[in-house]
Structures are given as C-alpha cells and as structure tokens.
A protein has these predicted regions:
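Structured extracytoplasmic
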Residues: 57-197, 205-211, 275-383, 474, ...
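Gly/Pro-enriched, hydrophobic low-complexity segments
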Residues: 190, 195-296
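Transmembrane beta-strand segments that form the barrel wall of outer-membrane beta-barrel proteins
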Residues: 226-232, 260, 371-384, 395, ...
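Outer-membrane beta-barrel translocator domains and adjoining extracellular loop/strand segments
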Residues: 269-271, 424-427, 454-460, 509-516, ...
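Residues that define the transmembrane beta-barrel architecture of outer-membrane proteins
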Residues: 388-392, 421-425, 479-483, 520-528, ...
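Residues on the lipid-exposed face of transmembrane beta-strands in outer-membrane beta-barrel proteins
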Residues: 392-398, 427-431, 485-489, 499-501, ...
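Repeated loop/turn-to-beta-strand initiation elements of outer-membrane beta-barrel proteins
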Residues: 402-410, 436-441, 493-499, 506-508, ...
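C-terminal outer-membrane beta-barrel translocator/porin domains of Gram-negative envelope proteins
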Residues: 440-446, 450-458, 468-473, 537-539, ...
Length: 718
C-alpha cells in the first residue's frame, strides 16, 4: 500500500493544477486487479513521469532559445554601436599539395608557383560596422613572408566577420543557428554548466553545406552568448571557427576574437590555413596610407609575440630585408645589376597572375578610386544557354568617390557567343551627383546585339514576285548598336523621374538584297525618352515604371520613326529562411510607326546577350523563347514568377542534397503576335560547382521545346 499511498498524494497535488486526476476508489480497485494489470499501471505511471520530464526539458530549451533570439533586440535599444574600430589579423598558410590547376583559383596564383610552402601574414585594419550589421575592413598595415605576392585568400575574410544573430552567419550563405527563422533546420540540446552558464549544442536536421554543427556557451538568464565553437564545409572549404563575443553592450553582439582553421581541397590541391583576429583594438597608428612590409610598425601593434614557428617562417624574409638595407656600394667597386629572369618576372609573374586572377587596385587619397578587372582567361567564366550556346563573359569596372554624396563609375562588360560567332559589349559611364536622391547622369554605348526585322524580307519577296531565294540569305538579321544618355533623379523615395535620348544604328548583315530593291541597309533612329518610377513602399518595395519613347524621322538625319509605350512592375518579396518570390509583370506597344522601316525593339522585353551567373537575368527572363518572337509583334504582355528557397526538393535527398545551395521554380507567361499564349516552366539548382536549370515551353497549347541552361559558379564569390 505504500506505493499507492505515494501516488494518492501525488495525484492530489497534481490535481490542484488540473493536469492529472486520480480517485482513491479507483486506486483501491486497481489493488484488486490481477498482477498483469498492476504492472501495466506501474508502466503508465513511469511513462507519465517521463512525459512530464520531457515537457519540462523542452519548455526550458524553448525558453533559452527565445532569450537567445531576442537578445539583440534588447541590446540594440539601449546603445548605438560604434561605427569604427581597429583589428589585428594574423594568418598562416601551409600548402600540402599543389598542381597547375591551383592557378585557376582566384587569388591563389601566387601559392601555385611561389617556391615556399609555408607563409605568414599580419595586418592592422580599420573596421567599419555598417548599418546592415556587416563589416567593411580596410587594411592599414600589412606584413607578409611572401613579399609582394598576394596570398591573403580574401574568401576567408567572410568567416572572420560572422554576424551570429543575422539569418545568415557567413557572407549571406551559411544559416545561423542563433536566428529564430532557422530554428526549423537545427536540433538543439542543453547541457547544464556552472553558475548561470550552460552549453547549447546544435546540429543540422539535414546534411547540407549551408548548415553548421557546434556548441555555444550561453548565459541562461539573459540569453547572451559568450563563446561559440562551430564546424562546417562551404565552397570546398572545411572550417572550424571559434568565436569569443564582446563582453558588454553593443560589443556583445559582435566578435571580440575569432580563430579559424580551414582546409581547401581542389582536384589534388590541399591548402591549410589558420587565422586569428582581434577586434575592438584602440587606434595605435596615425592616419597613414597602407604600408607594406614595415617590421617596426608591426611590432608596435602586435597584441602578442610571435611563436617560434612563426619566427622561422619570417626568417627568410627578414634575412632578405636586412641584406637590402646594407650598403653594398664601395668606392673601388661597381655594383652589378642583378639579372632579370624575363620568363619568370614578366611572363610568369606579371602576365600570368593577371590572366588567371582578378586585378583589384585602389588609388588616390584615402583609396577614393578603385579598378577591378576579371580574369582574362579563366574557363570558370564560361556559361551555356539554349539560345546562345556556350559563351564567355568578362567585366572591367572602375570608379572614383569625390565625396559621400558623389562618385563616378565606368564599366566594360563583354561576352562572346561561340554558337553565334558574336561579340557583344556594353560600356556605361555613370556620374552620381546626388547619391541621397539617386541623382545621376548615365551615358552608355552597346554593340554586337542582333535584332530581326521580317517585314523587310516580306517586302523583298513582293518586289521579286515571291521569290523564295531571299529566305536563305539571312536578310532579316541586323546588327544593333546604340548610344543612350539620360539623367535620373528621385524627388522622394517613392517617386523618380528620368529623361534623355536613345540613338540606334541597325546595319543589315547581308546588304545585297536591300541594294537590289533600292532600300537602305542601315536604319537609324534618335528618340527622346521619358520614364517615371513609382515605389509605393519606398526603395524596399515594388517598383512601377512607365516609359514613353518617340523617334522623329529625319531628326539628325535618321530614317526610322516610331512611338513606343511600356509599363513594367518588379518586386522581389523576401520570405522567411532566405526564401524569396520574384515577380515581374509588364506590357508594351507601338502607337505610331512607318509601314516596314520600323524595328520592334522593346526596352523591357528583349533577348539578353550578356548574362552573368545565377543572380543575373536568371529570373524574369524567357529561356527558350525564339529570337524572332522578340521582334515580330508590335505589342507584348508578360508575367514572370520565380520562387527561390535553400531547401526545396533535392536539398532533402541523401548525398546530392549536401551540395545544394539554392533551388528555384519558374513560371513565365507571354502574349505576343503568333504566340497566344506562350508558357514556360522551369526548375533550377545552384551548387558550389554549377547552376543548372531545366525548362519546358508551350506555345498556342502545344508543347514546343525542352532545354537546359548552366553556368559555372565555382569561385564566383571569391
């Protein structure tokens, strides 16, 4: 009876809370039951205790997670963050294996051919904390055992500037386990520790490159995280990251110290790195431009002395430095200039590095100017689309900041289509005179774009009694070059206005047929253009656009009159967990045109000849649409929808799911002349290696085409 008496007391106590009710008469009845029922009753009581304990543990875990998720909100309302700080970073590199393929990896060219396999770098940096929670790191002083060669491995800087309370932990890709939206992707367990501290263990619910495994030391009362240990693998980098957060106030939201160990594996290449960085240091050096290879200055700011191993790595560089400082001239001797190895210093070092690596150079006072050139010959910049086949892109861009509200930018974007044997380019020059109001003047030229005009071919047929010989002479294709110049100004975040002009010169690829019927083979137009932009929710919401363009015949010697209207609306709706819904709807039409001499060429409905990766024109475009349909109809109505998610379908599958970074679903619809309607469905994935899309089209109720599109994504974020 002792057991039953205990449970009677328990039942009475619990009945006060209205959760568990037992009657004394029921218990006496159970005593008289057979032994097997008695055992069942005991088992139920034990399960009851286990369930209550499990619910209690889950409730505690949820309470701790809630405090962690809401901790930044409590801190940010108390104090504004310091916008500028200083940091010391030390990095070491150990090249276990390397081959020629390492040269194709951005910023790894020097490691591929410099003699030593061990390197050490140090830097003193100015850190600017941006309003969006990101960091901007500007190097003030640097010291490297590799001398003038670049070894900084800039892709690793993203791992050293983690934003643990944001949705994405590292470079807008790795999902943070300390954000509420990502809770569904992680499993959490709590381990009690001394005082009010506890350890929070986390691991992903699925094996994916966007998720991490690790533990954090958390204050149970406030939810403040003091230290973090995590491991993961992203972009072929296996990493182990240790983070010590700041102690008080806003600094507790950012790292105080980070230690990173990583391993990069790529087709037989094996590079190990180790980084340490200390934030929130005082300003030690004066305002000087970036200084390189200054041992004395680095010794002044180094927070801790070098280890014996690090001194050994530096020893060769120190030896060369001291030998350079010695006075080698003598009164009775003539200095002999050292021999220059032309193959190594010119072909290998200077030309080779610039071919395989991107060039990024700052210039001017306070690094106000910058120039960046993509690798000239890098197969990783090759892409493929059903309409253009294989094509290669390159990009050159530079700019200069006059002030916080004024700058100027120049860009050259080019590409070559191997199927079309066609080179296209676009060169815009943009001067921002009022950045706060998006005020700028833009002037750009473009060439190499192909456009079609079937009406002129029809006129040739009529003039020659429907002779079909013209069909095989490719007379309907023209090479379109244009120059536009316009000014833009946003009066408010909701309303903007744009005015300028557009000049087109369209030249027939085959001029013979036009000469036979005394028709010009070159068509030019000069059109004033006006645009109005309306953003009902400001810059963060949708954008609605209305455009009016009118070309006047014989204006500046032109011969192609037309009047064109276009209306367009675009919006990318951000959803939870880095998901998004991209929407675009629009229409356009011609209201005034000549009989045959005009060209159907819309600004917001045209074939793209310079695509560039997953984030450029992979949404809001028609992948399988025939080129001729862009230029046949004097009107169009379009709608494009794209849903993007990191974990949609394939990400949940074994093996292959680990490499999936993004997935997309496409739905596009179009109504033009001869296509009523045109529908296109698609599905695409993005991995560290490739972005691959499969598309299917339907025109006028019949299945038309099926095709693929892919592009190399390898090292695109480096």
């Amino acid at each position: 009876m002792a057991f039953f008496q205990t449970n009677i007391i328990f039942a009475r106590d619990r009945s006060k809370n209205g959760k568990i009710l037992f009657s004394i008469s029921s218990l006496f009845y159970l005593v008289q039951m057979k032994n097997q029922y008695f055992k069942i009753f005991i088992l139920l009581i034990i399960c009851q205790y286990g369930l209550l304990g499990s619910l209690s543990a889950k409730s505690k875990k949820d309470s701790i997670l809630t405090r962690i998720f809401t901790y930044p909100e409590k801190i940010k309302t108390l104090q504004a963050p310091d916008t500028v700080s200083y940091a010391y970073m030390k990095s070491s590199f150990h090249i276990n294996k390397r081959n020629l393929l390492l040269m194709a990896v951005p910023t790894m060219y020097a490691m591929a051919h410099v003699g030593s396999r061990r390197y050490l770098e140090e830097s003193y940096n100015k850190v600017t904390f941006l309003p969006n929670g990101k960091y901007q790191i500007d190097k003030i002083l640097s010291l490297s055992s590799a001398g003038s060669h670049r070894l900084s491995f800039p892709a690793m800087l993203h791992y050293l500037t983690p934003n643990i309370y944001d949705v994405t932990l590292i470079n807008e890709n790795v999902l943070s386990p300390f954000h509420r939206q990502n809770k569904i992707y992680y499993k959490y367990t709590i381990e009690e520790s001394a005082d009010s501290l506890l350890k929070l263990h986390f691991k992903p619910r699925l094996k994916n490159t966007l998720l991490v495994t690790g533990e954090a030391e958390v204050d149970a009362r406030s939810g403040k995280i003091s230290t973090i240990q995590l491991t993961g693998e992203y972009d072929m980098i296996f990493y182990r990251l240790s983070i010590q957060m700041g102690n008080h106030g806003v600094q507790s939201l950012t790292p105080q110290n980070c230690s990173l160990t990583s391993r990069f594996l790529f087709f037989g290449n094996d590079v190990r790195t180790h980084y340490t960085i200390a934030y929130h240091l005082p300003k030690i050096l004066p305002n000087i431009s970036e200084a390189n290879q200054n041992f004395q200055l680095m010794e002044q700011i180094r927070p801790e002395p070098l280890t014996s191993y690090e001194k050994m790595v530096y020893s060769e560089l120190l030896k060369d430095k001291r030998s350079e400082e010695k006075d080698t001239t003598a009164l009775d001797s003539v200095a002999t200039p050292p021999k220059v190895n032309f193959v190594k210093s010119v072909l290998w070092d200077m030309i080779g590095e610039n071919i395989f690596n991107d060039i990024h150079q700052d210039f001017g006072p306070n690094k106000a100017g910058s120039l960046r050139i993509d690798p000239i010959l890098n197969p990783l910049y090759m892409e493929y689309s059903p309409s253009q086949g294989f094509y290669y892109n390159f990009n050159i861009r530079g700019g200069y900041h006059f002030s916080e509200n004024s700058n100027i930018w120049l860009q050259l974007k080019g590409g070559y289509s191997f199927r079309l044997h066609q080179f296209s380019f676009w060169i815009p020059l943009i001067y921002y005179f009022d950045i706060r109001h998006n005020g700028f003047i833009s002037s750009g030229i473009s060439g190499g774009r192909r456009i079609q005009n079937g009406n002129l071919v029809n006129e040739l047929r009529i003039a020659t009694n429907n002779n079909r010989v013209w069909d095989n002479l490719n007379l309907y294709e023209f090479n379109d070059s244009f120059w536009d110049c316009y000014a833009n100004y946003d009066f408010t975040p909701k309303i903007g206005f744009q005015a300028g002009f557009v000049f087109h010169r369209r030249t027939a690829l085959n001029k013979v047929g036009f000469e036979l019927i005394n028709k010009p083979s070159v068509y030019t137009s000069l059109a004033p253009k006006f645009q109005v932009h309306y953003r009902p929710w400001g810059y963060q919401g949708p954008t609605l656009m209305a455009c009016y363009e009118k070309s006047i015949k014989k204006l500046a010697g032109t011969n192609t009159p037309y009047t064109r209207w276009e209306f367009d609306g675009q919006y990318i709706l951000p959803l939870h967990n880095v998901q998004s819904l991209s929407m675009r709807v629009g229409t356009g039409f011609y209201t005034d045109r000549s009989h045959n001499d005009y060209f159907v060429d819309f600004e917001n409905f045209r074939q793209t000849f310079l695509p560039n990766g997953w984030n450029d024109e992979w949404s809001g475009e028609f992948e399988l649409l025939e080129s001729s349909l862009y230029n046949q109809s004097n009107y169009y109505v379009r709608a494009n929808f794209t849903y993007e998610s990191p974990f949609l379908v394939l990400a949940w599958t074994p093996l292959i799911g680990h490499f999936i970074e993004r997935e997309r679903l496409y739905l596009s619809a179009l109504r033009v002349k001869n296509a009523n309607p045109y529908l296109e469905l698609g599905y695409a994935i993005k991995t560290r290696f490739l972005s691959i899309g499969a598309f299917m089209s339907n025109m006028n109720g019949k299945t038309k085409d099926f095709g693929f599109k892919f592009g190399f994504e390898l090292f695109r974020r480096w």
